[in-house]
Protein backbone atom coordinates (compact mmCIF):
# COMPACT_ATOMS: atom_id res chain seq x y z
CA UNK A 1 0.00 0.00 0.00
CA UNK A 2 2.83 2.40 0.82
CA UNK A 3 4.32 1.79 -2.63
CA UNK A 4 1.12 2.99 -4.31
CA UNK A 5 1.07 6.17 -2.27
CA UNK A 6 4.64 6.86 -3.37
CA UNK A 7 3.93 6.11 -7.04
CA UNK A 8 0.67 8.05 -7.26
CA UNK A 9 2.34 11.50 -7.63
CA UNK A 10 4.65 10.12 -10.34
CA UNK A 11 1.70 8.63 -12.21
CA UNK A 12 -0.19 11.92 -11.98
CA UNK A 13 2.85 13.81 -13.30
CA UNK A 14 3.25 11.40 -16.21
CA UNK A 15 -0.44 11.75 -17.08
CA UNK A 16 -0.10 15.54 -17.23
CA UNK A 17 3.05 15.63 -19.36
CA UNK A 18 1.30 15.17 -22.66
CA UNK A 19 -1.70 13.86 -24.54
CA UNK A 20 0.11 10.70 -25.71
CA UNK A 21 1.03 8.53 -22.69
CA UNK A 22 3.68 6.63 -24.68
CA UNK A 23 5.45 9.88 -25.58
CA UNK A 24 5.23 11.33 -22.05
CA UNK A 25 7.96 9.00 -20.83
CA UNK A 26 10.32 8.89 -23.81
CA UNK A 27 13.79 10.44 -23.64
CA UNK A 28 13.90 12.04 -20.20
CA UNK A 29 16.60 12.87 -17.68
CA UNK A 30 15.83 10.80 -14.57
CA UNK A 31 18.00 11.25 -11.49
CA UNK A 32 17.87 10.20 -7.84
CA UNK A 33 14.46 9.34 -6.45
CA UNK A 34 12.82 10.08 -9.82
CA UNK A 35 14.93 7.36 -11.43
CA UNK A 36 14.07 4.85 -8.71
CA UNK A 37 10.35 5.66 -8.95
CA UNK A 38 10.46 5.29 -12.73
CA UNK A 39 12.11 1.87 -12.34
CA UNK A 40 9.39 0.81 -9.89
CA UNK A 41 6.79 1.93 -12.41
CA UNK A 42 8.40 0.21 -15.41
CA UNK A 43 9.49 -3.03 -13.73
CA UNK A 44 6.54 -3.55 -11.40
CA UNK A 45 6.57 -6.86 -9.53
CA UNK A 46 9.64 -8.08 -11.44
CA UNK A 47 11.81 -5.66 -9.52
CA UNK A 48 14.98 -4.16 -10.90
CA UNK A 49 18.73 -4.63 -10.78
CA UNK A 50 20.53 -1.85 -8.95
CA UNK A 51 23.68 -2.07 -6.83
CA UNK A 52 24.69 1.43 -5.79
CA UNK A 53 28.35 2.06 -5.09
CA UNK A 54 29.34 3.34 -1.70
CA UNK A 55 30.84 6.81 -1.45
CA UNK A 56 34.24 5.24 -0.70
CA UNK A 57 34.20 3.17 -3.93
CA UNK A 58 33.36 6.26 -5.98
CA UNK A 59 36.15 8.27 -4.36
CA UNK A 60 38.64 5.45 -4.99
CA UNK A 61 37.69 5.34 -8.68
CA UNK A 62 38.08 9.10 -9.00
CA UNK A 63 41.54 8.86 -7.43
CA UNK A 64 42.87 7.39 -10.71
CA UNK A 65 42.01 10.51 -12.69
CA UNK A 66 45.27 12.40 -12.33
CA UNK A 67 45.63 15.69 -14.16
CA UNK A 68 48.70 16.59 -16.17
CA UNK A 69 51.03 19.40 -15.05
CA UNK A 70 51.67 22.66 -16.91
CA UNK A 71 52.12 23.09 -20.64
CA UNK A 72 49.85 22.12 -23.51
CA UNK A 73 47.03 19.87 -22.40
CA UNK A 74 47.23 21.07 -18.81
CA UNK A 75 44.16 20.16 -16.81
CA UNK A 76 43.16 17.31 -19.11
CA UNK A 77 42.81 13.79 -17.68
CA UNK A 78 45.42 11.20 -18.59
CA UNK A 79 44.43 8.76 -21.36
CA UNK A 80 43.83 5.90 -18.90
CA UNK A 81 41.42 8.00 -16.85
CA UNK A 82 39.69 9.12 -20.03
CA UNK A 83 39.34 5.52 -21.18
CA UNK A 84 37.84 4.51 -17.82
CA UNK A 85 35.33 7.35 -18.03
CA UNK A 86 34.25 6.25 -21.51
CA UNK A 87 33.68 2.66 -20.36
CA UNK A 88 31.04 3.62 -17.76
CA UNK A 89 27.63 2.57 -19.00
CA UNK A 90 25.50 2.38 -15.86
CA UNK A 91 21.93 3.51 -15.44
CA UNK A 92 23.01 6.87 -14.00
CA UNK A 93 25.18 7.58 -17.05
CA UNK A 94 22.34 6.52 -19.36
CA UNK A 95 19.39 8.21 -17.66
CA UNK A 96 20.68 11.04 -15.47
CA UNK A 97 23.79 12.34 -17.22
CA UNK A 98 22.25 11.61 -20.61
CA UNK A 99 18.64 10.91 -21.54
CA UNK A 100 17.02 7.50 -21.68
CA UNK A 101 13.82 5.96 -22.95
CA UNK A 102 11.31 3.58 -21.43
CA UNK A 103 12.96 0.73 -23.33
CA UNK A 104 16.38 1.50 -21.84
CA UNK A 105 14.86 1.47 -18.35
CA UNK A 106 13.38 -1.98 -19.03
CA UNK A 107 16.93 -3.32 -19.49
CA UNK A 108 17.42 -2.94 -15.73
CA UNK A 109 14.35 -5.00 -14.77
CA UNK A 110 14.89 -8.49 -13.33
Swiss-Prot record:
Cross-referenced Gene3D superfamilies: Insulin-like (1.10.100.10)
GO-annotated cellular components: extracellular space
GO molecular-function terms, A-Z: hormone activity; identical protein binding; insulin receptor binding; insulin-like growth factor receptor binding; protease binding
Disulfide bond positions: 31-96, 43-109, 95-100
Keyword Disulfide bond carried by entry: yes
One Pfam family here: Insulin
Keyword Transferase: no
Domain of life assignment: Eukaryota
Coiled-coil blocks: none
Gene Ontology BP term (one): negative regulation of protein catabolic process
Function: Insulin decreases blood glucose concentration. It increases cell permeability to monosaccharides, amino acids and fatty acids. It accelerates glycolysis, the pentose phosphate cycle, and glycogen synthesis in liver.
Subunit-structure text: Heterodimer of a B chain and an A chain linked by two disulfide bonds.
Family in the record: Belongs to the insulin family.
Protein name: Insulin
Organism: Ictidomys tridecemlineatus
Amino acid sequence: MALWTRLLPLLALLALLGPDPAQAFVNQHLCGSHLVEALYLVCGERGFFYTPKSRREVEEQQGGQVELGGGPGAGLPQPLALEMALQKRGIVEQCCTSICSLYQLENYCN
